[in-house]
C-alpha cells in the first residue's frame, strides 16, 4: 500500500476527508519551495501534490502559471522536483507529482516512475493524459508500485467516468469546474453532482474521489469535505507566497491557511 492510500484510509477512519495541497517545485526557488511544502504539512495537509513546472500549462490559472514561470526562470530541474518530493515524504505526508505529460515523456517514462518511487513519491497526477493513451505509464507505474491519478470533469460521459476510474489508482481527481484553476467565491454546484456520478462508478472498487479547482477557504473546504474523500487546494497557497514580503512570512501564512483548511475538513458534516 502506498503512503497515499494509507493517508486516505486514515482520514476515512477518522470520519473526514483528506486535505490535499498543491505547490509547484522551485517557486520562488528550490530551497524556499521545500520550506513551503514543509509548512503545508505542518499546517495539516495529508497529501502534497508537487507541481512539475511547465512552460505551456493549459489547465492552470494565472496564479499557478505565474508561480510556475518563476520556478522555470529560477532554473528548476526534474531532479529538483524529486528533491521536493523527498522533502514532503520526510515531513510525513504522502507526496505526489502533478505534471503535464510532455515533461514525463522527455524524462523517460520508466525512469521517472522508478525515480519518483525512489524519492518516496506515492504517484503521479496527469491532467492531460487519458487512460487510452496511457499504456506506457500504466505499465511503468505498475512496475514501480506507485499510484496513477487521472481526471474526470463535469463534461465526462458515464463511459468516460468508468474508463477513467478503472485506470486510476490511489484516487480519481474530480475537477469541479470547467476551465482553468483558481479560487472561486462559491464552490461549483457541479462538484457535488460530479462526485455523485463518479461514486456510482467507484462504489464497488471503493476508489476515493478527491475534488479540486476553486476551493479558497475553510468553509468551502468543509462544504466539499461533506461529500468528497479529499479536498484539493493549490491557488490559495501560491497566492500567499506571491503576496508575502519574504519566505519566513510566506511559510507562516501558508501554515495558517493549511490549518484553516484542515479545520474545515474536520468540521464537515458527513
UniProtKB/Swiss-Prot annotation:
Pfam families: Trp_syntA. Keywords: Amino-acid biosynthesis, Aromatic amino acid biosynthesis, Lyase, Tryptophan biosynthesis. GO terms for cellular component: cytosol. Signal peptide: none annotated. Its EC number is 4.2.1.20. The active site is at residues 49, 60. It comes from the Bacteria. InterPro entries: Aldolase_TIM (IPR013785), RibuloseP-bd_barrel (IPR011060), Trp_synthase_suA (IPR002028). It catalyses: (1S,2R)-1-C-(indol-3-yl)glycerol 3-phosphate + L-serine = D-glyceraldehyde 3-phosphate + L-tryptophan + H2O. GO terms for molecular function: tryptophan synthase activity. It is an enzyme of class 4 (lyase). Pathway: Amino-acid biosynthesis; L-tryptophan biosynthesis; L-tryptophan from chorismate: step 5/5. Belongs to the TrpA family. The alpha subunit is responsible for the aldol cleavage of indoleglycerol phosphate to indole and glyceraldehyde 3-phosphate. HAMAP family: Trp_synth_alpha. Tetramer of two alpha and two beta chains. This is Tryptophan synthase alpha chain. The lineage of its organism: Bacteria, Bacillati, Actinomycetota, Actinomycetes, Streptosporangiales.
Amino acid at each position: 500500500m502506498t503512503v497515499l492510500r494509507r493517508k486516505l484510509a486514515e482520514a476515512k477512519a477518522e470520519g473526514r476527508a483528506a486535505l490535499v495541497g498543491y505547490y509547484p517545485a522551485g517557486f520562488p526557488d528550490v530551497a524556499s519551495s521545500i520550506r513551503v511544502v514543509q509548512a503545508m504539512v505542518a499546517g495539516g495537509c495529508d497529501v502534497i501534490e508537487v507541481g512539475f513546472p511547465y512552460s505551456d500549462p493549459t489547465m492552470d490559472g494565472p496564479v499557478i502559471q505565474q508561480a510556475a514561470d518563476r520556478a522555470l526562470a529560477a532554473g528548476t530541474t526534474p531532479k529538483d522536483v524529486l528533491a521536493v518530493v523527498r522533502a514532503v515524504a520526510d515531513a510525513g505526508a504522502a507526496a505526489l507529482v502533478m505534471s503535464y505529460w510532455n515533461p514525463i515523456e522527455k524524462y523517460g517514462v520508466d525512469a521517472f516512475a522508478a525515480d519518483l518511487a525512489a524519492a518516496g513519491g506515492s504517484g503521479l497526477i496527469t491532467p492531460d493524459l487519458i487512460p487510452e493513451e496511457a499504456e506506457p505509464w500504466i505499465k511503468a507505474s505498475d512496475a514501480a508500485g506507485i499510484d496513477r491519478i487521472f481526471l474526470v470533469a463535469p463534461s465526462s460521459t458515464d463511459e468516460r467516468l468508468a474508463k477513467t476510474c478503472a485506470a486510476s489508482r490511489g484516487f480519481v481527481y474530480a475537477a469541479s469546474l470547467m476551465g482553468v484553476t483558481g479560487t472561486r467565491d462559491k464552490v461549483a454546484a457541479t462538484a457535488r453532482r460530479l462526485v455523485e456520478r463518479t461514486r456510482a462508478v467507484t462504489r464497488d472498487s471503493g476508489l476515493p474521489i478527491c475534488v479540486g479547482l476553486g476551493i479558497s477557504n475553510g468553509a468551502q473546504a468543509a462544504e466539499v469535505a461533506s461529500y468528497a474523500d479529499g479536498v484539493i487546494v493549490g491557488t490559495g497557497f501560491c497566492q500567499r507566497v506571491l503576496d508575502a514580503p519574504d519566505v519566513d512570512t510566506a511559510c507562516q501564512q501558508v501554515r495558517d491557511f493549511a490549518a484553516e483548511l484542515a479545520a474545515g475538513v474536520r468540521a464537515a458534516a458527513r
